[in-house]
């Protein structure tokens, strides 16, 4: 269940989540209808085993999961059938249908195909830290993260969550770290980075599996390139790549964190899941607070 990416948003810590368990069943995922392309709603974080449990709270951490069902209707299939239909009309009537007629034909085909289309299921998990006012979504896509915010907004009626905003330019901070400026306590450089020329359409350099403080990197910095992605390690617990868009990618829990699971109490799948949730939530909080200080992240106003 460990998250692999983090797209973060902030919300006011004054928000009231006391009614969340009552509200979520009203916005639970419904099966996609015969003539619908997609459906979204909340599902159980625990999967099929506990379908009626739509949230999970542990102290100040709240785990929510947005589920989705999408009809798979390949565009190539629709277009192929459309061309056949157009050819039939042309042969029968001696004319090719115009733009509006083709659009109507295409809509009719989609309407006909939808009830028979395969359905693809998906889930997007999120952890809300109610004490510090942030939500971490397990995605590297800002759009997917915004979709989760929209679903929570639909459940609560109002959810003034905003993407992270740094009071200092993230590129400047990342570039400074790779150039030799001291990193925050607990952080160290990894072995991956991406550098870009600041001009639009400028050169992009990607480095992997190499020492990030050396002559080769220095030459790129001297040429004016700026760091847009940087691999970092937090203690011996987490490794990740931080982007100048403030999205955390390639998140990995290391032995320093995983060793703590050996001392968890309780037996069974649910107890193990609780232990992993507690560990992940605590480590993500540590990382967030570290980055909040280093990047001067703005707080959300009520």
Swiss-Prot record:
Major location (coarse): cytoplasm
GO cellular component: bacterial nucleoid; cytoplasm
Keywords recorded for this protein, A-Z: Cytoplasm, DNA recombination
UniProt KW Cytoplasm keyword: yes
Biological role: May be involved in recombination.
Listed HAMAP family: RdgC
Name this polypeptide is given: Recombination-associated protein RdgC
Record organism: Xanthomonas campestris pv. campestris (strain ATCC 33913 / DSM 3586 / NCPPB 528 / LMG 568 / P 25)
